[in-house]
């Protein structure tokens, strides 16, 4: 494989010295970019864009042409696994993702296959290989998956949810069915991420978007336990280099210590967690990624710069910080504000790495 020209993102995840704090943005390939909208229109719809390796590669690279980002992230969706299990994924205008056949009971779980990453999900691996080739070693490529709990919420609720009553009903009334589903998803995610690593992903991230809706006890039992299983089963080295793993539970700031015990390399923080506090609590064990409020990108560039300076000062001197937003970038953010953010991180962070 091509030698990596910029490895500061991988180095920061492993708490190794870097010249400046690396930065990338969750959903950096997305609707805030006019060029993304043009490519998506060309693809026809969102899943067609995900399933076309050339177009998925194109949208992955678009933000890197605009901004000096330190990593690329595979353009895909967390719902590729449930889709490959045959749940019939479709997107309703204004509604988000929906499934035609949600999972309602243990019998439904038993019927679900564990998808073969090189077969039913082969289009994702083709995209990974294509992106790695086209990146030409400029920056590392991040692969990702949803967490078992987060995938299960969509599969049981039949789509997005505000109150999560359907999956919580299963959790409390039929926990055996939910554990069977989560176990199957943990196996599927492990295979899927390992296939992404073999195809060329140089780091992987597990997005636990909905872990924060659980009580602490339920989080341990129904979310973290299964992420821990995945971390235990991942390839941690490929192509002669360590493959760092980041866990991100949105709304999970109170559980950082437990998350750091999984053996992952880094934890993602949302904007509700104080990064100085997070570093005091777990900075000796893991790197931290985050954690500016994505809505700050609506502010004037001078205000964005102030916020970047505050977060950098909060983390403080030394290694182990990857700058990011606390969640995905909003679709109506002015692209030049994202540029001001990236530039501010690089310019203002140098003093912390001397």
Swiss-Prot record:
Binding residues for substrate: 27-31, 77, 154, 209, 327
NCBIfam families associated with the record: hemE
Coiled-coil intervals: none
One of the Pfam families matching this protein, by short name: URO-D
Catalysed reaction, written as an equation: uroporphyrinogen III + 4 H(+) = coproporphyrinogen III + 4 CO2
Subunit relationships: Homodimer.
GO biological process: protoporphyrinogen IX biosynthetic process from glutamate
Annotated metabolic or biological route of this protein: Porphyrin-containing compound metabolism; protoporphyrin-IX biosynthesis; coproporphyrinogen-III from 5-aminolevulinate: step 4/4
Family as reported in the entry's similarity comment: Belongs to the uroporphyrinogen decarboxylase family.
Function: Catalyzes the decarboxylation of four acetate groups of uroporphyrinogen-III to yield coproporphyrinogen-III.
Keywords noted in UniProt: Cytoplasm, Decarboxylase, Lyase, Porphyrin biosynthesis
Gene Ontology MF annotations: uroporphyrinogen decarboxylase activity
EC number: 4.1.1.37
Subcellular location as annotated: Cytoplasm
Xref: InterPro entries: UROD/MetE-like_sf (IPR038071), Uroporphyrinogen_deCO2ase_HemE (IPR006361), Uroporphyrinogen_deCOase (IPR000257)
The protein's enzyme class: lyase
Organism: Citrobacter koseri (strain ATCC BAA-895 / CDC 4225-83 / SGSC4696)
One Gene Ontology CC term in the entry: cytosol
Site (Transition state stabilizer): 77
Name recorded for this polypeptide: Uroporphyrinogen decarboxylase
């Amino acid at each position: 494989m091509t030698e990596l020209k910029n490895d500061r993102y991988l180095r920061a995840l492993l708490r190794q010295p870097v010249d400046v704090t690396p930065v990338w943005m969750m959903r950096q390939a997305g609707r805030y970019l006019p060029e993304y909208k043009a490519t998506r229109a060309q693809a026809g719809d969102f899943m067609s864009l995900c399933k076309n390796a050339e177009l998925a590669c194109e949208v992955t690279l678009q933000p890197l042409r605009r901004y000096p980002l330190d990593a690329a992230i595979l353009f895909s969706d967390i719902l590729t696994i449930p889709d490959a299990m045959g749940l019939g994924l479709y997107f309703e205008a204004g509604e988000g993702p929906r499934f035609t056949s949600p999972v309602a009971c243990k019998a439904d779980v038993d019927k679900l296959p564990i998808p073969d990453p090189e077969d039913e999900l082969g289009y994702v691996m083709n995209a990974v290989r294509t992106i790695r080739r086209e990146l030409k070693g400029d920056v590392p490529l991040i692969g990702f998956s949803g967490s078992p709990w987060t995938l299960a919420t969509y599969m049981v609720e039949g789509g997005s949810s505000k109150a999560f009553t359907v999956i919580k009903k299963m959790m409390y009334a039929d926990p055996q069915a939910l554990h069977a589903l989560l176990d199957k998803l943990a196996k599927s995610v492990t295979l899927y991420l390992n296939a992404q690593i073999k195809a060329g992903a140089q780091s992987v991230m597990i997005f636990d978007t909905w872990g924060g809706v659980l009580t602490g006890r339920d989080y341990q039992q129904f979310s973290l336990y299964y992420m821990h299983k995945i971390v235990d089963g991942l390839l941690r080295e490929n192509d002669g280099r360590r493959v760092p793993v980041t866990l991100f539970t949105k709304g999970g700031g109170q559980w950082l210590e437990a998350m750091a015990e999984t053996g992952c390399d880094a934890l993602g923080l949302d904007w509700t967690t104080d990064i100085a506090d997070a570093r005091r609590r777990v900075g000796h064990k893991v790197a931290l990624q985050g954690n500016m409020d994505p809505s700050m990108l609506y502010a004037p560039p001078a205000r964005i710069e102030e916020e970047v300076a505050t977060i950098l000062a909060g983390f403080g001197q030394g290694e182990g910080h990857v700058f990011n937003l606390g969640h995905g970038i909003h679709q109506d953010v002015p692209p030049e504000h994202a540029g001001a953010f990236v530039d501010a991180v690089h310019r203002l962070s140098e003093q912390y790495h001397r």
